[in-house]
Amino acid sequence: MRSSHRLAFLFLLPSLIFVGLFAFYPIFESFRLSFYRSILTLPWLGHKMVGWENYTDLWTDPVAAQSLRTTVFFVVTTIPLELGIGLGMALVMNEVFRGRGLLRAIVLIPWAIPTVVSSQMWRFIFNDRYGLFNFVLFGGDASRYLAPLADPILAPLTIIVAEVWKTAPFVALIVLAGLQTIPDELYEAASIDGATVWQQFRHVTLPLIRPALLLALLFRTIDALRVFDLVFVMTQGGPADATNVLSFYGYKKIFAEGMVGYGSAIAVGVFLVSLILSLVYLQILKSSRLERTPR
């Protein structure tokens, strides 16, 4: 090993140790526990090796199937909304006008607020008695109200609204970074050729910010798959499991029912899906960069 490589490795070593302790070890431990039958509320039953039994039970569990459908619905709904809204916000923030810096700072406030705090805020907003949602919807008439957090149809939508409000600014920040790498000369040349604003956006802007969009898509898909804190604070998976996503279902199995092995199997499933999607997105991102590389 050359001295420069050795020095680089020494600089990386503390980070590698940190990641190993706080990321790789929990993943390994979850894999290990998923092959055991261990119920914390029934300790006299012991810690029994059951092989793939937790995974076969998970495959036939109707609640797990419902949680999977809820998670998929959450992902396929929030991601397009976040990308669309984030792209629009980035295009506005990329324009030159007075107060642009202040606008960028304000836009990032939802992302900067801790998720637990913003979840509690949205829980108050959607409260059926004193929430702002009912006040605006019914013009302050306290005798009329909706209870969106207690409605199996509306409750998932409240989670989606809270998620998009918080994470669209993050997407906007990534896309804005991509927009600022596009040379102005390309737009000037397109204008000289008679391209309209839409044509410039379609043939100049979109192709050049594709890597930024893919990166935002990767981050947001992984984050949406493991959504937990919004559900924990706002609905606790209810009503009637309408917002019971996989991460929260695994949490309930471990900490409410004491089924450590089964809950670990759920966690492993979420991790593997996230890993596969990450590898697919990274391959697409790599292909996109190779297409842009001059030959």
What spans do the regions from the language model cover?
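A structural signal for multi-pass alpha-helical bundles of membrane permease subunits
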Residues: 4-295
